[in-house]
Amino acid sequence: MQKYMLEARQLLALAIPVIIAQVAQTSMGFVDTVMAGGYSATDMAAVAIGTSIWLPAILFGHGLLLALTPVIAQLNGSGRRERIAHQVRQGFWLAGFVSILIMVVLWNAGYIIRSMDNIDPALADKAVGYLRALLWGAPGYLFFQVARNQCEGLAKTKPGMVMGFIGLLVNIPVNYIFIYGHFGMPELGGVGCGVATAAVYWVMFFSMISYVKRARSMRDIRNEQRFSKPDMDVLKRLAQLGLPIALALFFEVTLFAVVALLVSPLGIVDVAGHQIALNFSSLMFVLPMSLAAAVTIRVGYRLGQGSTLDAQTAARTGLGVGVCMAFCTALFTVTLREQIALLYNDNPEVITLASQLMLLAAIYQLSDSIQVIGSGILRGYKDTRSIFFITFTAYWVLGLPTGYILALTDLVVDRMGPAGFWMGFIIGLTSAAILMMLRMRFLQRQPSSVILQRAAR
């Protein structure tokens, strides 16, 4: 029991800074929306439309680079720290290649925006302008993630937290300057949010690089002074590990976007109630997601040390802590659901619907916690391909079709509206949790030599 308590303390020490960093990053999006809304409703809508396209694109790159964390954790645990700098350098090359792809996609996103039904031309122009300003921050964001993953792979999660707050503090005044045109800058409205956020990502990157170069704990693994060409073998391995994570993230984000589109014709009350419940549940999701990042680090480190039993301890402890967190957040959601909904809106019909949907959100928080921590465990074992297949099957083959049938058809029961989609979420997330646990048990029952060989690749 003592070893589990010790592991839980180490996991929480890693996870808490990640939680705070995630809150800071989420707050940046909130600040953009509020400040753009203060300028005009059209500009706020333009930022919302642009963000809905930006997020799937940038999260694809973000997911691809998550492969670095278990690789670095494993090298650190095995005492091969001299190889970490080369992996990080190749991570920068990968980030550069993906940045170009993302920038090309975002530059041409105007075709998607202008094809939307009945979109106002002025709104479309502002949304395109916002994206074309923001896309210049894509390399800065992804380079920052490489440096952050280096730190987190070495069990240093506080730098990411600090840089997240630096980004938030810089974002507010720079937003103000470019939205309203102060200090000789042009008045850009919502487009100014894109300029400011792009600049902030570069500030976060240079701040993180400055820390990495000066940190005593990383003195022995600093990047070599000489230029390093792309190493195709390393890049291929990182891509093989990262691509399934990237696709899983992409399909998860697009799932919620598709549900939002399917709910939109049901009316203002249904849309508002759905959005309130989804926004709050997304906030609660930060807790298990951050714990999953910590579990990836601990499992990778223990496998690097050559101890499959300690890796199992880290995995079980992460699941135990995650389940406890889920029960707490579910109880909080059930008890205060009406008060939470009132923070968003005062329409009685919206409050009633949002409160009902939050009950369903409370039910799936346990499954959500298990599946995301399970995903973190599998990343630690470098078994990322199964993550993609599990999430795709659970969300798109089981969850979304079931939700559609329950919400918008009479095939099984009378049309349930938004609640039907939330029943689909419960089915999808529960399926993902079960499949993740089955895959984890399958991996852990393999011979130690097989597990360690896979981890060392």
Swiss-Prot record:
HAMAP family: MdtK. The keyword Hydrolase does not apply. It comes from Enterobacter sp. (strain 638). It is a multi-pass membrane protein. GO terms for biological process: sodium ion transport; xenobiotic transmembrane transport. The keyword Cell inner membrane applies. GO terms for cellular component: plasma membrane. This is Multidrug resistance protein MdtK. The lineage of its organism: Bacteria, Pseudomonadati, Pseudomonadota, Gammaproteobacteria, Enterobacterales. The gene is mdtK. Belongs to the multi antimicrobial extrusion (MATE) (TC 2.A.66.1) family. MdtK subfamily. It holds the Pfam family MatE. The chain crosses the membrane at residues 11-31, 53-73, 93-113, 127-147, 160-180, 189-209, 243-263, 276-296, 314-334, 357-377, 387-407, 418-438. Multidrug efflux pump that functions probably as a Na(+)/drug antiporter.
